Amino acid sequence: MARRILVTSALPYANGPIHLGHLVEYIQTDIWARFQRLRGNECYYVCADDAHGTPIMLKARERGVDPEQLIEEMAASHQADFADFLIGFDRYHSTHSAENRHFAELIYQRLEAGGHIERHTIEQLYDPGEGMFLPDRYIKGTCPRCAAPDQYGDSCEACGATYTPAELQDPVSVISGERPEVRESEHFFFRLQDFEALLRQWASAEHLQPEIINKLNEWFEAGLRDWDISRDAPYFGFRIPGTEDKYFYVWLDAPIGYMASFRRLAEERGIDFDAFWDAGRAEETELYHFIGKDIAYFHTLFWPAMLHGAGYRTPTAVYCHGFLTVNGQKMSKSRGTFITARSYLDHLDPEYLRYYTAAKLSDSVEDIDLSFDDFVQRVNSDVVGKLVNIASRCAGFITKRFDGRLAPRLSAPELFRTFTASAERIAELYEQREYARAVREIMHLADQANQYIDAEKPWERIKDPEQARAVQEICTMGLNLFRVLIIYIKPIMPRLAEDAEAFLAIGPLAWADVQAPLLDHGINKFKPLKTRIDPQQVEAVVDASKETLAQSESSEPAQGPSGRLAEDPIDEPITIDDFAKLDLRVAEVRVAEAVEGADKLLRLELDLGGETRQVFAGVRQAYSPEQLVGKRVVCVANLKPRKMRFGTSEGMVLCAGPGGEDLWVVGPDEGAEPGMRVK
């Protein structure tokens, strides 16, 4: 019996273009959805633009347009990029829609009726010039712990301390430059702790990956807190029913966008919406969310609790993936590795990135790396040199010598059975999102197909008229092996599959078609299905990305220092005695883990060559914990220990960069050992 499945990806924010980091998730989800359809399941894939929030409101104002116009432009850009990358959404919608307003209000009203919404008065910083309360990221000032200037309203990137905006010294509004004032405001809170038993039970089942279950258990141990679901006007979003100046926080209505998108699709196609969302019918269908590991908190705590509290089903599973690094480092605009989807599409085949991404992905939250050299080598070797080459080596003989007709029998039926016997194993790997292992299986079979052709040597046999029938059967065999491989690779490379189907003069292939060979059948003249990547094409993508960055920067001529020094001038001179006060040591990171409640902090355990130190470092937006374990860093070893609400920090790790995602840990050259002094 066919399964009934609804699949979603996280919603891209509608204030900027799609980039390669985004595409990891959409490629991963699209492959899985295509595989399910290929297997004969009823599978729908929906998504939407996340179109609410202060950043969109302010960006629209900066451009002199209404927020509605901005999100409309972004929607067109996003959908064009997704279409060109062959992301096969059944419906792409927007959170700024009538459907989303309906469900946001309905869920809120049901939660309120159930006693799960409370109101509390809180203190916030208010910009009197702009007439608005300021989110943490729109406040800057001096850190109350280390006195570092130009720090955000929630944490210090210099020392890693966290604090409330009210504690920030000399605060300034990023929007107006004015000093904000403290004002009180009534906010609406969702009582998450009401659902702890449900969430613990849900997390213990097979709904999540082990790494995410471990993280959930940490959150449970720390205690679930009420969630502020409201924002004050002015705000671009949906007004909370019964209020005049309160709006739903963007993270409340964003996941509800999954429901809104599917509702629109259901109305368009006559699908039973309730079968996929009603709590009483959860056994009839399956619901899967594919997301990045950075938003697991919202999707594994708030979202299932909201759904359950409002009478809807909880997800069958939430699948998290890691981030994308490029050439071993996080994406960087200055290096040209912060690549937009469009910059890539202007120079390279989208299926090459789909293939390479699949060849890296597994059911893990580990980050994956796009190495340009490996990308070129793997695509040229696997896709062109192995897979497509099978058809290229066989097709010419069939069309030129046998009038484009395949033989009525296979020359090596046992080898064909070996290929078809792999169907269930490869299917299981797709099902478990172990794409890298599936690709290895497929390419191993491609190697066997090429070895078969090498051994049979049809180019030599064709010289003997008496072996013409054998050559026809050998090439028929080769093309049938190619056809099986195309079925296996079809979820990853749908356009290649479509072109192969046209060449073989057959209709759309399904997974079940692997079992029966294609015999005594006319095919079309072969045309190259894929071409090799020229490394210069990759260079062109990088150069184009750098040009995009340059165009976005000010065109004003530089006055005085240029480059980084213009942005961050050198401080006043110090004496050698001042410098000598710092005891800098090489240290090795033995443990790295995220700090609950601190978006920027990682807790590090550093080996200083005989002594272990605990350090809280504000590098979470730039590095995952896994990237730092085993890494050698430079530590300020004689910094006075500082008590923080998460524990005591016993040093400081040196980093370069302006902060946030643009941060690089400073490390010693090879050979430096933990405990060595840095002079």
Curated annotation (Swiss-Prot):
Residue span, tRNA-binding domain: 578-679
Cellular component annotations (GO), alphabetically ordered: cytosol
Listed InterPro entries: aa-tRNA-synth_I_CS (IPR001412), Anticodon_Met (IPR041872), Met-tRNA-synth_bsu_C (IPR004495), Met-tRNA_ligase_1 (IPR023458), Met-tRNA_synth (IPR014758), Methionyl/Leucyl_tRNA_Synth (IPR015413), MetRS_core (IPR033911), MetRS_Zn (IPR029038)
One example of a Gene Ontology biological process annotation: methionyl-tRNA aminoacylation
Role: Is required not only for elongation of protein synthesis but also for the initiation of all mRNA translation through initiator tRNA(fMet) aminoacylation.
Family indicated by similarity: Belongs to the class-I aminoacyl-tRNA synthetase family. MetG type 1 subfamily.
Entry protein name: Methionine--tRNA ligase
